[in-house]
């Protein structure tokens, strides 16, 4: 591509109120232009980056057997009413009527559409599992769009869906997606972490978020070194899977500490860990709660969870027979029952978080329902030694949050991907459809897997930039190589060399047409500034002085290092450089 035939669209100045840095650089480098609040046009440079990200996603999704489809953004309202999300979704769901007064929505997601499609197309259980995905535009009527395309009203997503007649099949696909997302984000060049998450209004039981590190967000994530067990058990907090919990220290949080006093609670745990010279990964806390069941009977329950985890009643209510509200008991409320806390195997029902249950493989647990990922109901537990109960220090008044942060590294993050095991939330209609067609009585479960493609672009910029502009990872750069001929219209040998190299390099598969030849009649300073701003990884500089020595200059954008290469070796040099990157 020649700059004289390209819409470069770089600008020097942008509004001072424009933030964050990724949005500034996307405007300055001519990637996007704002049309209205939360709505953007993608210019050629930005679109080239988007397409390369999409190509990576296509390749990796195809490797695990997902088939691409394309569904309309306009969706009939009756599908959303059937799923119950017509009223649940809120004002972000843009509703409208057509000329015949039929109700529609602009789809923020496509669960309803895909289940309707599968319901009408699938005839037999022999066609399962079904794995489909699309890359498509979504629309959410955000109240406060901000940070450029990071939080916009119109955006591009990859959303995948899988349908299964066996739970194990769903879990295997979920695991494959989990692994493939790691490959996708690493190829793109993102630094990220994975956290267990609440499914929110999408629904389901099991859910993981992929979070990119991003300094300009208020969302904080405690970071652990992660591995993922295929049996859907947990994300461990060490580099290997050999977590051995020799001593189980139970911290009963029955004191009158409010739920908002997270720092106070964590400080107590920290002192417990220091006292026993243990690790936070090896510490379990025991929370006493008061729960009403479906028979309106109130009972005491205990939750055994790892010390670093926060109590989340949204996860707890997913267990059958439990009804909100859930109350954490204070010391006064439970004084008469205090003797029940001295051993873990007491008459008080114990619900063990899945992370704890799977980590404690030295012990035998009975009646664990492995389909419930967040909390496990068990009827019996073994006797455990060295149990500490009711550790409570009421004289602690000042909280040093820095001490807690040393135990749990905190990073600012933003969501770039989300995967769900939806269960039967959307697939019941498919069961009934197939049963009507051929009387197959199936138990279909569903998975959903999303990636925010337009959000990835600014996230990469946030992690890869300097004072001169963007520094694109090689695989998603708008161009892999830039050729800057200095005063090419003044020196004929500079022009001829630039044209010859442009032609030769374009024929090499590893480079192809990913070359930008800056053939403008511009001051060299402007050319260097624009190419650095665009973030093209590899830069070739051709000048009259260097050609006199049969040399050209090569600049690596990431480091800024310039080296001179013999003209007769430059093709081989660039080919090897690009293949290694």
Swiss-Prot record:
Keywords for this protein: Aminoacyl-tRNA synthetase, ATP-binding, Cytoplasm, Ligase, Nucleotide-binding, Protein biosynthesis
Q: Does the keyword Ligase apply?
A: yes
Q: How does it assemble?
A: Homodimer.
Domain topic, free-text comment: Consists of three domains: the N-terminal catalytic domain, the editing domain and the C-terminal anticodon-binding domain.
Q: What does this protein do?
A: Catalyzes the attachment of proline to tRNA(Pro) in a two-step reaction: proline is first activated by ATP to form Pro-AMP and then transferred to the acceptor end of tRNA(Pro). As ProRS can inadvertently accommodate and process non-cognate amino acids such as alanine and cysteine, to avoid such errors it has two additional distinct editing activities against alanine. One activity is designated as 'pretransfer' editing and involves the tRNA(Pro)-independent hydrolysis of activated Ala-AMP.
Family recorded in the similarity comment: Belongs to the class-II aminoacyl-tRNA synthetase family. ProS type 1 subfamily.
Q: What is this protein called?
A: Proline--tRNA ligase
